[in-house]
UniProtKB/Swiss-Prot annotation:
A single MF term (Gene Ontology): polyubiquitin modification-dependent protein binding
High-level lineage: Eukaryota, Fungi, Dikarya, Ascomycota, Saccharomycotina
Protein name listed in UniProt: Ubiquitin domain-containing protein DSK2
The organism of origin for this protein: Saccharomyces cerevisiae (strain ATCC 204508 / S288c) (Baker's yeast)
A Gene Ontology term for the protein's cellular component: nucleus
Location of cross-link Glycyl lysine isopeptide (Lys-Gly) (interchain with G-Cter in ubiquitin): K13, K76
Gene3D superfamilies from the UniProt entry: DNA helicase RuvA subunit, C-terminal domain, Phosphatidylinositol 3-kinase Catalytic Subunit, Chain A, domain 1
Biased composition (Low complexity): 231-270
Stretches assigned to the UBA domain: 327-371
UniProt domain Ubiquitin-like: residue ranges: 1-76
Amino acid sequence: MSLNIHIKSGQDKWEVNVAPESTVLQFKEAINKANGIPVANQRLIYSGKILKDDQTVESYHIQDGHSVHLVKSQPKPQTASAAGANNATATGAAAGTGATPNMSSGQSAGFNPLADLTSARYAGYLNMPSADMFGPDGGALNNDSNNQDELLRMMENPIFQSQMNEMLSNPQMLDFMIQSNPQLQAMGPQARQMLQSPMFRQMLTNPDMIRQSMQFARMMDPNAGMGSAGGAASAFPAPGGDAPEEGSNTNTTSSSNTGNNAGTNAGTNAGANTAANPFASLLNPALNPFANAGNAASTGMPAFDPALLASMFQPPVQASQAEDTRPPEERYEHQLRQLNDMGFFDFDRNVAALRRSGGSVQGALDSLLNGDV
């Protein structure tokens, strides 16, 4: 007698036949034949419990027609057998790893989407960017050259746009991006909302927006337009223009009058070029506390504001909307139902895990299984 068990993983579903006396490891091998997921990457959940390889299927009281949830995980970087065979090496590696705990912390259990690019697996099959594209000082991002046009043409490629949308739709990839960037980590759940925002995706695939962002990055460079002496040259040159040269002598009165006229003109024309330059309002010296930073003895960029960055990629209509005050059972109704189907019935833990993951069921599931909440 064999059991017909439904395997669920996100939106995917499979049916696997297995004998009740079979071990969970044999059960995973049958699943591998059905969907091709390696046995080492399978985590099976039934009634809120992770199935152990050495236990039998019938020991978990799994009946015919029941559903078992499959969570795909990454293989461990080092097996227990390898660690036991090299005790001295393992001890030294553990000491070395303890010295740099932040290098791989939170990397989604070793998830590295760029691993294949640094190996010989696809050597000769991928056309990598030219060497000067990412040259000194950022290459194409900081120089007005043909390399910048090459990058913009790549943004216009429908295949590239499709790949970007697919990447931002992958929860595991979003976790990797957030956990690899301290600034995104500081944003909390807003980082995931920003990366999933339609406006943010449009910006990544819109050549005009990319061009404006490059110009804005050059203008916000604290060293742009300033010589080694840090004199009176403007730190915010015109978009697309070269940084002004520093003169040997500086007329303080003339610079002051020029700054006042620039503030008046920017205030008069603020909004006239909003469609052409989405960052035009940020370049108004009257509203910019760093407008006269070039005359100071030392300059610096303002502190990173996660809330401000997240608000830049929110649709305008959301700015006037009130904060979502719905109770958790309404806000996370769909996600809570999925967790209940997997056997997680602790309401408080489920809500805490969903808030921690920004509403992602996959992230909440990892938090519940790892005991983070």
